[in-house]
Curated annotation (Swiss-Prot):
Protein name as annotated: Bifunctional protein GlmU
Gene from which the chain derives: glmU
Reactions accelerated catalytically: alpha-D-glucosamine 1-phosphate + acetyl-CoA = N-acetyl-alpha-D-glucosamine 1-phosphate + CoA + H(+); N-acetyl-alpha-D-glucosamine 1-phosphate + UTP + H(+) = UDP-N-acetyl-alpha-D-glucosamine + diphosphate
Subcellular location, record wording: Cytoplasm
Cofactor: Mg(2+)
Cited PANTHER family: BIFUNCTIONAL PROTEIN GLMU, NUCLEOTIDYL TRANSFERASE
Pathway(s) where this gene product acts: Nucleotide-sugar biosynthesis; UDP-N-acetyl-alpha-D-glucosamine biosynthesis; N-acetyl-alpha-D-glucosamine 1-phosphate from alpha-D-glucosamine 6-phosphate (route II): step 2/2; Nucleotide-sugar biosynthesis; UDP-N-acetyl-alpha-D-glucosamine biosynthesis; UDP-N-acetyl-alpha-D-glucosamine from N-acetyl-alpha-D-glucosamine 1-phosphate: step 1/1; Bacterial outer membrane biogenesis; LPS lipid A biosynthesis
InterPro entries assigned to the protein according to its UniProt record, in alphabetical order: Bifunctional_GlmU, GlmU-like, GlmU_C_LbH, Hexapep, MobA-like_NTP_Trfase, Nucleotide-diphossugar_trans, Trimer_LpxA-like_sf
CDD domains per record: GT2_GlmU_N_bac (cd02540), LbH_GlmU_C (cd03353)
Record region (Pyrophosphorylase): 1-226
EC number assigned by the record: 2.7.7.23, 2.3.1.157
Cytoplasm recorded as keyword: yes
UniProtKB keywords: Acyltransferase, Cell shape, Cell wall biogenesis/degradation, Cytoplasm, Magnesium, Metal-binding, Multifunctional enzyme, Nucleotidyltransferase, Peptidoglycan synthesis, Repeat, Transferase
Main location: cytoplasm
């Protein structure tokens, strides 16, 4: 059996944030959610999160994950003290305990699997994850004997000059035989500079300690401040871009674009500079996004272009052109072959196939049929100060420039609205609707007496 414990009790003082450190966002998910996801493929029998600082907030954020046990560490007195809180929780448990850190979010699933499998194959009491760092300053050094066993872990400040030349470091991630660990946990001492209980000290107490070296040291980067958060974001973003480039997506300027891990792309998608995708985006084949666009929880069909525009929680069909400077807001549903042009905003509306809203319009709480042509400056006046009302426009209708449709109102099929009209009443199929003051021209106005 396998139990996973994630250490998530720390304050994260150096983040200088009201948000607990483990809830800081990284490419669309919190740090601790990424850590939990990295171990999901192991299908652990128990998953425990050791919480402390703002425990209620952490539990509330993660409650939806399910099958997650929360263990309170109060006060927070070191990593060894955190794992001691599992003694009553895992009473009678037989198997391995995998200990992960809630602020180390770049671990790959295959690295964790390698650690657990290596531990099981070696029959060790503990197997720790190690990394060779170009600059190991500040890290504890791991020393290994000829048989591959860990002979010692020496903190940086205690290393001799010769020992400092060793760049094999302790990543602080462990796989234990739980029964062996449970015997030594009560023996931990606070006899150290910080007066805390260190989980690292258990390694020297256990008869057989082994290690597995991580291939990519970036995987064990911890996060203690905003700079390190940004560095990890950069690493993760590069991973995501590399993955999708291998799947047939073109990034014109990769470093200027950001993705969420929940994005999915078809083939031959081109992403122009300064384009950002957040949340769960689904992008079809042959789309061109950007430059300078933001998509969030958006679903696009194939052959869609988005130029200098924002698409949030909207659905877009095939062959649609969006922008420049358009804004599709939540619940906008744009059918195949539409054109959503310059400075157009669409909110909570359905736009039928082949319809065009080319310039300077607001379409809100509306339903447009197929092949509707919305003239420049057409506005659906949907709000009466208390409630929102719907506008319905039938197939093949067209509105002239600078028209106002005051909802609730329905225009039938093949209706024409004269330019500059304010329409307040329903219009039947095939009709011409004009709602504007009669033009009055007064001759000689410029020459009138002062």
């Amino acid at each position: 059996m396998l139990a996973v414990a994630v250490l998530a009790a720390g304050k994260g003082t150096r983040m200088k944030s009201a948000l607990p450190k483990v809830l800081q966002p990284l490419a669309g998910a919190t740090l601790v959610e990424r850590v939990l996801a990295s171990a999901a493929n192991l299908q652990p029998d128990r998953r425990m999160l050791i919480v402390g600082h703002q425990a209620d907030r952490v539990e509330e954020q993660l409650a939806a994950i399910g099958l997650l046990e929360f263990v309170l560490q109060q006060p927070q007195n070191g990593t060894g003290h955190a794992v001691q809180q599992l003694l009553p929780v895992l009473q009678g448990f037989e198997g391995e305990l995998l200990v992960l850190n809630g602020d180390v979010p770049l671990l790959r699933a295959e690295t964790i699997e390698s650690l657990v499998n290596g531990h099981r194959e070696s029959g060790a009491d503990v197997t720790l994850l190690t990394a060779r760092l170009e600059d190991p300053t500040g890290y504890g050094r791991v020393f290994v004997d000829a048989d591959g066993k860990v002979s010692a872990i020496v903190e940086h400040r205690d290393c001799s000059e010769e020992q400092l030349s060793n760049n094999l470091t302790n990543a602080g991630i462990y796989c234990f035989n739980w029964q062996a660990l449970a015997e030594v946990l009560p023996k931990l001492s606070t006899d150290n500079d910080q007066g805390e209980l260190y989980l690292t000290d258990t390694v020297a107490m256990l008869p057989k300690a082994m290690h597995v070296e991580v291939a990519d040291p970036d995987e064990v980067n911890g996060i203690n401040n905003r700079k390190q958060l940004a560095q990890c974001e950069a690493v993760l973003q590069q991973r995501l871009r590399d993955h999708w480039m291998a799947e047939g997506v073109t990034f014109v300027d990769p470093g200027s674009c950001t993705l969420s891990e929940n994005c999915c792309f078809g083939r031959d998608v081109v992403i122009e500079p300064q384009t950002h995708l957040r949340g769960s985006c689904r992008i079809g084949d042959n789309c061109r996004l950007g430059p300078g666009s933001l998509l969030e929880n958006a679903e696009l069909g194939s052959d869609v272009s988005v130029l200098h525009s924002v698409v949030r929680e909207a659905t877009v069909g095939n062959g649609v052109a969006i922008g420049p400077f358009a804004h599709l807001r939540p619940a906008a549903d744009i059918a195949d072959g539409c054109r959503i042009g310059n400075f157009v905003e669409v909110k909570k509306s359905q736009v039928g196939a082949g319809s065009k809203i080319n310039h300077l319009s607001y379409i809100g709480d509306a339903s447009l049929g197929e092949n509707v042509n919305v003239g420049a400056g057409t506005i659906t006046a949907n709000y009466d100060g208390v409630r929102k009302h719907r506008t319905v426009i039938g197939d093949g209708s067209k509105t002239g420039a600078n028209s106002v449709l005051v909802a609730p109102v329905t225009l039938g099929a093949k209706v024409t609205v004269g330019a500059g009209s304010t329409i307040t009443k329903d219009v039947p199929d095939g009709a011409l609707a004009i709602g504007r003051a009669k033009q009055l021209s007064k001759e000689g106005w410029a020459d009138r007496p002062a």
